[in-house]
From Swiss-Prot:
Keywords recorded for this protein, A-Z: Ribonucleoprotein, Ribosomal protein, RNA-binding, rRNA-binding
Name the UniProt record assigns to this protein: Small ribosomal subunit protein uS17
Keyword Ribonucleoprotein among record annotations: yes
Pfam families given in the database record: Ribosomal_S17
One function term, GO molecular function aspect: structural constituent of ribosome
NCBIfam families assigned: PRK05610.1, uS17_bact
Name of encoding gene: rpsQ
Taxonomy of the source species: Bacteria, Bacillati, Bacillota, Bacilli, Lactobacillales
Key word Ribonucleoprotein present: yes
Subunit relationships: Part of the 30S ribosomal subunit.
Protein family: Belongs to the universal ribosomal protein uS17 family.
GO cellular component: cytosolic small ribosomal subunit
BP GO annotations: translation
Superkingdom of source: Bacteria
Protein task: One of the primary rRNA binding proteins, it binds specifically to the 5'-end of 16S ribosomal RNA.
Amino acid sequence: MTEERNQRKVYQGRVVSDKMDKTITVVVETKKNHPIYGKRMKYSKKYKAHDENNTAKVGDIVKIMETRPLSATKRFRLLEVVEEAVII
């Protein structure tokens, strides 16, 4: 069981929305080579993740893991809050 879970995708990103109950929106930024020119391009993708205890807040750096479909758009769950946001 644990070996299978280790093959699931794990991403690290920043929480941009926590307005939904038990759901957060995480932006994951990655770099990819352009297919023709070879330049490293930065791109980002938003994922909705399940946050059972509503622990993550906007601005936090979190780790999310791929899981079974939890709703029409949720395919990830919160693993841990790596770094909490600094409130000014």
